[in-house]
A protein has these predicted regions:
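N-terminal pre-catalytic "stem/leader" segment of glycosyltransferase-like enzymes
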Residues: 1-58
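Carbohydrate-associated surface elements
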Residues: 98, 120
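Conserved donor-binding/catalytic core segment of Leloir-type glycosyltransferases
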Residues: 131-149, 154-157, 170
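A charged, aromatic-enriched C-terminal amphipathic alpha-helix characteristic of glycosyltransferases
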Residues: 25-30, 268, 272, 289-329
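Active-site proximal beta-strand in glycosyltransferases
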Residues: 47-76, 90-94, 115-118
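Nucleotide-activated donor-binding/catalytic signature segment of Leloir-type glycosyltransferases, i.e.
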Residues: 184-206
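Acidic donor-binding loop of glycosyltransferase active sites
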Residues: 216-230, 243
């Protein structure tokens, strides 16, 4: 029987004494903290790698790679271009089927060595949306890092076509969420534009609870994303919060929003993207109060609260971890994740 590959910290991963940065509150951290707190005993039976190895791995434990990053990330490319890198792991957990397929196509990761468990949220309570009339503008929201389309959004709402549209845009955006404050420097001009615009409220980084409350009090999530996301928790929260989502068909966004979003074909040309997004958003604002849109948003919430609910996904996590632990104990040299 062949010797099991040695588990090491791969070059490009960040060494740290803690698996999860205690000051970071991005999607990866939120998801990991929840799973780890729900099943501490099961979790402790494995080595965990959250996209990048951060701590030394115990060679006496099976290792799981929970991949949140895109296959195009430079550090990820460095890892997966090494022969049989993925063989170090008993199982690779992807957060979307789009992501799983891309890793298979680009790096040859076998489907039988991975599983998809989509990200999860707790449903958002929505009592009643704010009314829209001559004294109460339609409420738009952007809640993501600034590199995911904030520049396109600002160009649109500052355009001539939007001068006569009564709207209020709330912007929650900063790399402080990921404990990467220094990354904000290159986006300060965008933040300044937000602060100077009379129809925009800039909040920077706020707690996830505050973001969810903001979703429940907003009408449209404006998201002209130009970054190929592997999953979008913000979109899930917008769906549960009853927001109409305007976004491109790019990365895993079509999978996450599951045809409920007002989406459009992605354009790599920034000017074309901006133009298309502008007119789709204008149509969304114009038609938001239509009965068919309201019915769609109700169905959207039911879908999201059913399939992205933590209660739904936690049972899948428990089943997978239990099965993998049992299989590893039976034959630690040849784990069979395809049985999960």
């Amino acid at each position: 029987m062949s010797e099991k590959p040695k588990l090491v910290v791969i070059e490009g991963g960040k060494r740290d004494n803690e698996l999860i940065d205690p000051k970071a509150n991005g999607g990866t951290e939120i998801q990991a903290r929840r799973v780890f707190s729900e099943f501490p005993d099961l979790v402790d039976k494995f080595n965990w790698v959250l996209s990048y190895p951060k701590i030394d791995l115990d060679p006496n434990k099976p290792s799981l790679l929970w991949m949140h990053e895109t296959p195009f990330d430079q550090g990820i490319q460095q890892q997966f271009q090494k022969p049989d890198y993925w063989n170090q792991y008993t199982q690779i957990i992807f957060v979307s089927y789009w992501q799983q397929q891309m890793f298979h196509i680009l790096y040859g990761v076998p489907y039988e060595n991975s599983i998809v468990i989509q990200n999860s949220i707790d449903p958002i309570l929505v009592s009643e949306k704010p009314k829209i009339d001559k004294n109460n503008p339609i409420k738009l929201i952007y809640a993501s890092s600034p590199n995911r389309g904030l520049d396109i959004l600002l160009n649109v709402v500052e355009s001539e076509e939007f001068k006569d549209i009564d709207f209020e845009l709330s912007v929650y955006s900063s790399f402080k969420l990921y404990n990467r404050k220094s990354n904000d420097i290159q986006f300060e001009n965008l933040f300044d534009r937000c602060k100077k615009h009379e129809k925009i409220k800039y909040y920077g980084t706020r707690s996830n609870e505050e973001i969810k409350e903001a979703m429940s009090n907003s009408h449209i999530m404006t998201y002209p994303n130009s970054y190929a996301e592997t999953s979008c928790i913000t979109a899930m929260e917008a769906m549960s919060g009853g927001c109409l989502i305007v976004c491109p068909k790019y990365g895993a966004l079509p999978e996450t929003t599951s045809e409920f979003s007002w989406s459009y074909n992605f354009e790599s040309d920034k000017m074309r993207h901006e133009t298309i997004f502008k007119y789709v958003l204008m149509e969304a604002i114009k038609n938001y109060d239509q009965n068919n849109v309201k019915q769609m948003l109700k169905l959207q919430k039911v879908f999201c609260d059913t399939f992205y609910h933590w209660n739904t996904k936690l049972s899948i996590w428990e089943q997978m971890l239990t099965a993998l632990h049992s299989q590893y104990n039976e034959d630690p040299q040849t784990p069979t994740p395809e049985a999960v």
